[in-house]
Amino acid sequence: MAKRIIYNEQARRALERGIDILAESVAVTLGPKGRNVVLEKKFGAPQIINDGVTIAKEIELEDHIENTGVALIRQAASKTNDAAGDGTTTATVLAHAMVKAGLRNVAAGANAITLKKGIDKATEFLVGKIQDNSKPISDSNAIAQCGTIAAGNDEEVGQMIANAMDKVGKEGVISLEEGKSMTTELEVTEGMRFDKGYISPYFATDTERMEAVLDEPYILLTDKKIALVQDLVPVLEQIAKTGKPLVIIAEDIEKEALATLVVNRLRGVLNVAAVKAPGFGDRRKAMLEDMAVLTNGQLITEDAGLKLENATLDMLGTGRRITINKETTTIVAEGNEQAVKARCDQIKKQMDETDSSYDKEKLQERLAKLAGGVAVIKVGAATETEMKDKKLRLEDAINATKAAVEEGIVPGGGTTLAHLSPILKEWADKNLKGEELIGANIVEASLTAPLMRIAENAGSNGAVIAENVKTKPFNDGFNAATGEYVDMSSAGIVDPAKVTRSGLQNAASIAGMVLTTECIVADLPEKKDSASPAGAPGMGGDFDY
């Protein structure tokens, strides 16, 4: 296919136009008074949301070059979402500000490579400062504050996540389900999560999120490598009659058997997903036995004289819901408390008997997985559109609280970055010179962009507020919800340090890439064919056959 090639300033300006469009669409959602965005869907009701990365994923422009700019900024949002689970809008606004300031300097004749070096050095300095100023999370109140801010100032959600973390521990599993009522409820059930995802992406039931979600599934557990599909046929036929989904957790599944399962899944004959069992050797077998206890099933192993081809439905485990993505599998089990408790006691006894610290550690991991349980938040709302928005906010809030537990919290509302702006300027003036200093100044000028946008979305003058905040102590900032300057930590306006750090790093990375672009190669726009002449012999007018 023919390509068009664009050079120099023209290339960078075309990228900038795409970046402007995406940044503006996403930035309207920033802060406590940020607005919503409506996404039109080809099928079903439109989606009304407030989530930066979801909006970014929806934007496709007609112009291929501008679309490349959109894709670059979308990457900053996506990477931040993958690393910290929140802060995608902040990353987009930061990247946009850095690109705008950087392009002005490149147009004026600055060397883009040296500018990028300055941007990278400034970012490295700021990451250290964010870590220095972060405070570890000490109580559930701080967790609730973090969740509240990430969920768009919804205190009920923040409190619910804090309660969930109290019940399942800070490393525990919190899963989301669509509820049946108007209210959002918290429930703690038996369950576990392990670090193995689906063997093939074709098992995903939700292609947008690339997840396989199976309700009320049967669970086949075996420590055997499944090489031939014939071994599975008897049990698959029994399950197909029940109409329920099936999850296979095995040592491995060979290509032939896997291909058969995928084809059956795609044709809708059987809703099935397959996962490799976690761990190795005896430890893998022990973990599979834990799962068998949890799901009220049996581990099909030749050590116990059980063969796959003779498996019956009674030997299979059952669960309330299983969610599988490319990296993890979460099992939410039905009530089976007595058996789980007995299994936990057995593991504790093994821990007392072993002298090896390594074995003790691994047994402790198994105990935590089995005893920790899963906190299930059932999202309630009046309409499906509201439920989808609420679910995205809850997801952000859960990710933000986990990020806060990992790396601590910093003052929120764009305050931390705004306060670091004069600190960076002072450091850069002493340590950098020439165009590297200009690169650092680009970052310094961009640091107030999130705060300015939050203030503007609340109807205030962003530039004035950013300057006022810089003169105040580090913890003080602008509360956009009330329009007052407050101590952010006392007011409960906090962000996870990991979210702020990831957003800054990804924004700087994308800005550096855009500034050092000198040429773009893109597809030529396709010429639209004029409609075929109506009524031609054997043709149905404009219809394609």
From Swiss-Prot:
It comes from the Bacteria. GO terms for biological process: protein refolding. It catalyses: ATP + H2O + a folded polypeptide = ADP + phosphate + an unfolded polypeptide. Its EC number is 5.6.1.7. GO terms for cellular component: cytoplasm. Keywords: ATP-binding, Chaperone, Cytoplasm, Isomerase, Nucleotide-binding. ATP binds at T29, L30, G31, P32, D86, G87, T88, T89, T90, G413, N479, A480, A481, D495. Pfam families: Cpn60_TCP1. It is found in: Cytoplasm. InterPro entries: Chaperonin_Cpn60_CS, Cpn60/GroEL, Cpn60/GroEL/TCP-1, GroEL-like_apical_dom_sf, GROEL-like_equatorial_sf, TCP-1-like_intermed_sf. CDD domains: GroEL. The keyword Endoplasmic reticulum does not apply. GO terms for molecular function: ATP binding; ATP-dependent protein folding chaperone; isomerase activity; unfolded protein binding. Together with its co-chaperonin GroES, plays an essential role in assisting protein folding. The GroEL-GroES system forms a nano-cage that allows encapsulation of the non-native substrate proteins and provides a physical environment optimized to promote and accelerate protein folding. Forms a cylinder of 14 subunits composed of two heptameric rings stacked back-to-back. Interacts with the co-chaperonin GroES. Belongs to the chaperonin (HSP60) family. This is Chaperonin GroEL 2. It comes from Prochlorococcus marinus (strain MIT 9215). The gene is groEL2.
